[in-house]
């Protein structure tokens, strides 16, 4: 399947644009002075390509790095140095895709996915195959803390997936149940549901889908314990018909967040501590291959609003939002470009960087409360994908 879609496999990348003011009605943004300049630092690798998926307020970055043998491990960058987080016994961990994962909190706790040494007895591709090479092994969510990677339990099935962690150490994602669901899209066999893990108390809580749906998955959690994710059919997590509805779980209640008018691919990617949600949604007429997704911002006051894209592009995704209301993501045409939405204005991040910088800022996946951004750039000299941190330089009058 062709998927320019960043959540599944960003095979195509998006064209450039310039600063654009959004013309459709939008939810309000808190006032932030637009940065006049960003300094971009490229981070070291473990010997191969890399990308950043999350950045916390101390400026630490979680993501993945390739190794010289071609395998890929989850990684944590602290103060310019890289740490290999290892695996759960398999060959690979971390995520290769345009998502804001692995999750990382302000204490440096990382949540993500890893292959294990065990084989999947049902021959499922599971969600991991969308994010790293499928090898027939069971894939589980993990929490990494204090130098130790620990597997998170499933709901009775074989596979699991961790996507986000808040400062209380509560982790969200999705996991298989023991239920064989005949409606699943092959090769998926088992039903999967959204999960809230609380490792400190060893509690695992299933988060139900909307009434009438069979499947759910959670993608992010904020400091207040509000969780966002998807509800739908047993298809490809976290997209296609599995994402028939974008949802919010809050104090035991699941709420439909609406859509931009299409039938599927309505996927929240992040929620800030004010409860503002960003992600992507199919517009009317959108197809199953998600070639024309639209970035959205959802607020309780304004509902879901289309954030637009760079001129000439056909797809956009909002991947993270900080507590100041700044949003980062991608806008895609022939190639993808990292973008920033701020005060109702869409910026191509490259336009805010020193012209002498020669890399292609391919994606912006995460932004902290200081405005630092991480994601993936392409080194124009070597063609290698690398993790970057863009730090705003605020000019005082």
What are the residue ranges of the model-derived segments?
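C-terminal motif of bacterial Sec signal peptides marking the signal peptidase cleavage site
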Residues: 12-15
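Residue-level hotspots at or immediately adjacent to binding/recognition sites across diverse folds
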Residues: 17-397
């Amino acid at each position: 399947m062709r998927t320019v879609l960043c959540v599944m496999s960003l095979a195509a990348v998006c064209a450039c644009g310039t600063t654009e003011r959004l013309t459709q009605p939008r939810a309000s943004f808190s006032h932030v002075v637009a940065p006049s300049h960003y300094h971009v630092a490229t981070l070291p690798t473990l010997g191969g390509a890399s990308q950043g998926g999350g950045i916390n307020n101390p400026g630490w970055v979680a993501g993945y790095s390739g190794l010289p043998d071609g395998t890929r491990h989850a990684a944590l960058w602290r103060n310019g140095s890289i740490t290999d987080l290892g695996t759960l016994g398999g060959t690979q961990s971390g995520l290769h895709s345009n998502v804001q994962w692995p999750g990382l909190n302000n204490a440096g706790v990382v949540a993500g996915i890893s292959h294990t040494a065990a084989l999947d007895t049902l021959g499922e591709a599971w969600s991991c195959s969308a994010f790293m090479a499928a090898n027939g092994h069971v894939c589980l969510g993990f929490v990494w803390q204090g130098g130790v990677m620990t597997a998170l339990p499933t709901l009775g099935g074989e596979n699991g997936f961790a996507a986000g962690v808040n400062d209380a150490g509560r982790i969200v994602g999705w996991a298989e149940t023991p239920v064989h669901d005949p409606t699943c899209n092959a090769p998926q066999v088992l039903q999967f549901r959204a999960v809230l893990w609380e490792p400190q108390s060893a509690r695992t809580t299933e988060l139900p889908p909307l009434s009438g749906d069979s499947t759910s998955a959670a993608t992010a959690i904020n400091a207040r314990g509000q969780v966002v994710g998807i509800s739908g059919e047993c298809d490809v997590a976290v997209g296609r018909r599995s994402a028939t509805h974008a949802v919010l779980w809050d104090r035991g209640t699941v709420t439909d967040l609406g859509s931009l008018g299409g039938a599927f691919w309505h996927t929240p990617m992040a929620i800030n501590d004010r409860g503002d949600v960003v992600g992507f949604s199919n517009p009317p007429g959108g197809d199953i291959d998600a070639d024309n997704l639209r970035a959205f911002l959802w607020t309780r006051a304004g509902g879901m609003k289309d954030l637009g894209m760079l001129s000439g592009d056909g797809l956009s995704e909002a991947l993270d939002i900080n507590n100041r209301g700044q949003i980062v993501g991608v806008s895609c045409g022939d190639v993808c470009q990292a973008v920033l939405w701020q005060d109702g204005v869409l910026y191509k991040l490259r336009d805010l960087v020193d012209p002498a910088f020669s890399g292609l800022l391919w994606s912006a996946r995460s932004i902290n409360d200081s405005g630092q951004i991480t994601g993936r750039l392409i080194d124009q000299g070597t063609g290698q994908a690398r993790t970057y941190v863009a730090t705003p330089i605020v000019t005082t009058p």
